[in-house]
Amino acid sequence: MGWLTKILKGSSHKFSDGQCNGRYREDRNLEGPRYSAEGSDFDKEEIECAIALSLSEQEHVIPQDDKGKKIIEYKSETEEDDDDDEDEDEEYMRAQLEAAEEEERRVAQAQIEEEEKRRAEAQLEETEKLLAKARLEEEEMRRSKAQLEEDELLAKALQESMNVGSPPRYDPGNILQPYPFLIPSSHRICVGCQAEIGHGRFLSCMGGVWHPECFCCNACDKPIIDYEFSMSGNRPYHKLCYKEQHHPKCDVCHNFIPTNPAGLIEYRAHPFWMQKYCPSHERDGTPRCCSCERMEPKDTKYLILDDGRKLCLECLDSAIMDTHECQPLYLEIREFYEGLHMKVEQQIPMLLVERSALNEAMEGEKHGHHHLPETRGLCLSEEQTVTTVLRRPRIGAGYKLIDMITEPCRLIRRCEVTAILILYGLPRLLTGSILAHEMMHAWLRLNGYPNLRPEVEEGICQVLAHMWLESETYAGSTLVDIASSSSSAVVSASSKKGERSDFEKKLGEFFKHQIESDSSSAYGDGFRQGNQAVLKHGLRRTLDHIRLTGTFP
């Protein structure tokens, strides 16, 4: 009893005062409600201790004088009633405790539901923003294509520029000459200012007559005094002004694109970037970026890699240059496969190598399908020694990479797959898609798939590369998994990297476009067949069908 008294001295004092002259029952009933009202300030343990203390004091009060005897006698006479009251008090206190607990649970549940509702609304709002942005980008691409078509039409129209002359003249060098006879002024209203044209010089063209100062170029707003002028949408232009506004310019040399021997304006345009350039740049050695394929403009310098490739500065911004730097991305690709329930159990070495080392390794490989203009990744099955890029090079004079450290690496075969080799110096998204492609080769070999035709093996590998790019494009938003029946929605761990630049997002769309528009039989046709199969049947059923038949379903 000592430790209870120490904790609840106030409560002990109040209950002991209520035990004299037979008024214990009445005082306890008065004290009970007040105590329950204050009980919200105590936790359950304090209330239970108070009840135990009260009961203990009632049972152990044994006075020694005559008055004490009276009290004891009174208690024994009313002992049964007191027990009932005590039971009622305990029941009341327990009811209060249960009510308080229920209220706490209800409030907590309401708070949880409110928080979940708020998060769901925030997620929905974010998804709507991303979808709106995607629609905006699609609209911009559509407008770019429309603008390109309009440029082509304008280029043709330029060849048929309108030659407008005045009525028969005495001086052929003067476009502004009077009529050989007088016309009443009421019959001559200037199309430009709607005022009458009096006696004097005037210009007759475009189905009307003009004051010389009213017939102006729509671009520079200066009078057109030349014998010839150009038209666009019923608006007149100086020939030079029209050319400046509507004649296509080369995005590489920044000059007007010249006409061909037939007198027509002919130029090339990249199907994705819409970069316009003179046909001559395809023959004069103008370099292209090895990643995005854009030509190098004359006022911009591309970075020169050790193996001769050139890299634009935008692609350089996210380029992966050595094996160590690529390891986090390699782990992300493995996590991507785990999310598809296609975990690669074997720890396969992954190395970044130069182009020469990749070509040598490809020659030593006994089997494989490599029909691309340039091999950028390889899944090895044979023991070889390859040279890997050990340390990231730095940029030296003339935008050349220098001080790159390499070392030979002996690859020992411990399973069906020896290593995965990736070409160094490519942007993160391109490196990741190549890794996802080669990882699928490894998965097929480690899981006992038979020797497949190139269209089937390369096609399904391209499907996985495309799926990874899709997950990167929509990272952080709601994904509709294209392999819906085979796995849950896959969100790449790269979504933790934060917001990517607009160019990197555009670059991801370009790499998807490359896969989708590939014209080769193994990679292009194979991807389109495999992608249709996955969309229709799901990834898991497609893989099961390939295992059984060696073909797409």
Swiss-Prot record:
Positions of the UniProt region annotated as Disordered: 10-41, 62-91
Biased composition (Acidic residues): 78-91
Residue ranges with Basic and acidic residues bias: 62-77
Biological processes annotated in GO: regulation of DNA endoreduplication
Domain UIM, residue spans: 42-61, 87-106, 122-141, 149-168
Modified sites of kind Phosphoserine: S166
Modification(s) after translation: Polyubiquitinated by DA2.
Domain LIM zinc-binding, chain residue ranges per copy: 188-248
Gene Ontology MF: a single term: peptidase activity
Disruption of the gene: reported phenotype: No visible phenotype.
Keyword Zinc: yes
Stored InterPro entries: DA1-like, DA1-like_dom, UIM_dom, Znf_LIM
Record Gene3D superfamilies: Cysteine Rich Protein
Keywords: LIM domain, Metal-binding, Phosphoprotein, Repeat, Ubl conjugation, Zinc
Listed Pfam families: DA1-like, LIM
Subunit structure: Interacts with ubiquitin, TCP14 and TCP15.
Function: Acts redundantly with DA1 and DAR2 to regulate endoreduplication during leaf development. Together with DA1 and DAR2, modulates the protein stability of the transcription factors TCP14 and TCP15, which repress endoreduplication by directly regulating the expression of cell-cycle genes.
This protein's domain notes: The UIM domains bind molecules modified by monoubiquitin or ubiquitin chains and promote coupled monoubiquitination.
Name of the molecule in the record: Protein DA1-related 1
